[in-house]
Amino acid sequence: INHHEFMNKIPMTAEGYTKLQYELKKLTSENRPKIIEEIAEARSHGDLSENAEYQYAKEQQSLIEGRIIDLESAISKAEVIDVKSVEGDDIKFGATVEIEDDESGEKQQYQIVGEYESDIENKKLSITSPLARGLIGKTVEDNVEINSPKGLKSYTILSVKYI
């Protein structure tokens, strides 16, 4: 595999890949037809230049079509990685990492995932985020310093798992 081809690939967990496929299916089978109906409905109300409903529906359509293009592109470039088969103690894509904030003692656990599947509420951290970039390549008991919006933060890595 040449380097250029690999650069175009987007690493993704199987769960993340399935989620993107589901979102794409929902957009193409539900949202797209619905917005086309709304545009037709708004159009039937006459003068389009003064028609806020029509303008709004067209904007929504543009957002939906943009997202569909993004998703199709991401799915076509996806390199699905079986996280359970990753070996080693150092942090790589897919790792579930427990860290401790050296200042507050607060413990947090994150899984490092692709940028299309990041979801902070569910502790899915984008591989492109400053924290994930700081963690990659490190291992248990390593200390990591990250520039955050709140200044320099220091963390200790408590565990690294591939689950």
Give each language-model segment a name.
Residues 81-161:
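Non-DNA-binding regulatory cores of transcription-related proteins
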Residues 24, 28-31, 75-79, 139:
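Conserved NTP-handling cores and scaffolds of large molecular machines
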Residues 65-79:
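Amphipathic alpha-helical coiled-coil segments
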Residues 7, 22, 43, 49, ...:
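Residue-level signal for pocket-adjacent positions within structured domains
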Residues 9, 160-163:
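Short hydrophobic/aromatic patches at helix-to-coil boundaries
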Residues 1-3, 141:
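Short intrinsically disordered, low-complexity coil segments enriched in acidic
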Residues 3-69:
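N-terminal cationic and glycine-rich segments that engage phosphates or anionic surfaces
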